[in-house]
């Protein structure tokens, strides 16, 4: 199999909970664990913000970051204990090319000046990439930092599957998102666009994936789009069911099936998946992880976050010798920021709060049944 460009490394400085944290990634599957608040989703969004191509509604990385983190102020993304003038910087390497974006925490504006590229009119619109959102009023009230993007690196369109199901919430969502303020982040909007866009042709071809058929078979029918209503349906031999009436776990399966059918997950692309286990019965996890591994074997780089032992163990059990899987553990540290450890061997991942908790359950069950600890010590 040819080697496709992939995300090789990442460094987060003063980015939300990260003070100065570095990652070295696998070209295959990158599984990320950590307790709540350790920054797993923030890590994915930091990469996606650069990876995501600009669009009419989200023209630059400044707008992308604010919509990904649902904030009007970029300074909210800067680590909270930094001082004015401190630098938020995200750097990475993709296909042996370096890229970066950065922002300063600025003092509160006192003259109403917006941020631009030197050609702005104080409106906050600016014309340079990475400045403003075109919605400033000259007050500078929400422009206490600005983001500058450099090292333009061409990347394949990424896919971000949020933990929140969106397959059942398609009716009118995109229109509403563009016309009123909705409290949904940009990943929810983006994935609906990919659900609705037709298949495209890519120079790298598509992913031949037998597990895709197995996932489709789990649904028991075909995913059908109704353009007039803006809704998806599951069409079976007995009729069709509105997606909101389909079980959420099956809608998650349907999301992956739809993305593959639309040819968005192709060799050389990147899949970011935030907690794939949400609303999914463990009985479905074997086929799901089989599909994830199949994608990685055909050149799709995968980043997934999880709180599930089943996800981790399925990756461990199903991996072939040639599979490239790396496990990351994030550990929150209020003073030094979130720290990371990584390994290619699931059994040696430390710290591993998921495995520790399952081990604790076993110990408690053993004590309840026998009155002794795992070492044979009498507890009662």
Sequence positions of predicted segments:
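Pre-Walker A-like glycine/lysine-rich segment at the N-terminus of P-loop NTPase domains
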Residues: 1-49, 379
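Phosphate-binding P-loop
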Residues: 21-27, 263-266, 294
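Walker B catalytic acidic pair
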Residues: 274-276
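Conserved hydrophobic alpha-helix in the ABC-type ATPase nucleotide-binding domain
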Residues: 287-288
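Loop/turn-to-beta-strand initiation segments
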Residues: 267-269, 299-303
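H-loop/switch region of ABC-family ATPase nucleotide-binding domains
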Residues: 305-307
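Phosphate-coordinating catalytic segments in nucleotide- and nucleic-acid-processing enzymes
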Residues: 1-11, 50-269, 333-380
């Amino acid at each position: 199999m040819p080697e496709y460009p992939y995300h090789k490394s990442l460094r987060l400085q003063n980015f939300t909970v990260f003070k100065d944290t570095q990652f070295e990634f696998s070209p295959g599957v990158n599984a990320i664990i950590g307790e709540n608040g350790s920054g797993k989703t923030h890590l994915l969004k930091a990469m996606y913000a650069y990876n995501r191509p600009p669009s009419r509604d989200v023209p630059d990385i400044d707008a992308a970051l604010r919509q990904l983190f649902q904030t009007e102020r970029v300074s909210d993304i800067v680590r909270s204990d930094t001082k004015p003038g401190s630098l938020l910087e995200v750097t990475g390497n993709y296909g042996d090319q370096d890229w970066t974006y950065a922002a300063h925490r600025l003092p509160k504006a006192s003259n109403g000046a917006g941020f631009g590229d030197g050609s702005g009119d104080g409106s906050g619109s600016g014309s340079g990439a990475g400045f403003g959102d075109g919605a400033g009023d000259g007050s500078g009230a929400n422009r206490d930092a600005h983001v500058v993007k450099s090292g333009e690196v061409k990347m394949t369109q990424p896919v971000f599957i949020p933990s929140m199901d969106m397959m059942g919430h398609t009716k009118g969502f995109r229109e509403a998102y563009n016309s009123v303020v909705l409290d949904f982040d940009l990943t929810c909007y983006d994935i609906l666009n990919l659900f609705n866009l037709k298949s495209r042709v890519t120079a790298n071809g598509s992913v031949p994936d037998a597990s895709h058929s197995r996932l489709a078979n789990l649904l028991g029918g075909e995913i059908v789009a109704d353009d007039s209503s803006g809704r998806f349906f599951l069409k079976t031999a007995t009729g069709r069911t509105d997606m909101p009436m389909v079980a959420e776990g099956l809608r998650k399966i349907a999301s992956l099936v739809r993305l593959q059918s639309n040819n968005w997950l192709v060799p050389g692309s990147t899949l970011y998946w935030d907690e794939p286990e949400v609303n999914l019965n463990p009985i479905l996890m074997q086929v799901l992880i089989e599909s994830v591994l199949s994608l990685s074997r055909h050149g799709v780089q995968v980043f997934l976050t999880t709180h599930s032992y089943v996800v981790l163990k399925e990756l461990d059990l199903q991996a072939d010798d040639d599979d490239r899987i790396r496990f990351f553990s994030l550990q929150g540290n209020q003073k030094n920021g979130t720290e990371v450890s990584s390994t290619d061997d699931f059994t040696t991942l430390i710290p591993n709060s998921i495995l520790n908790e399952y081990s604790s359950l076993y110990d408690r069950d053993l004590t309840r049944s026998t009155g002794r600890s795992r070492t044979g010590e009498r507890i009662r």
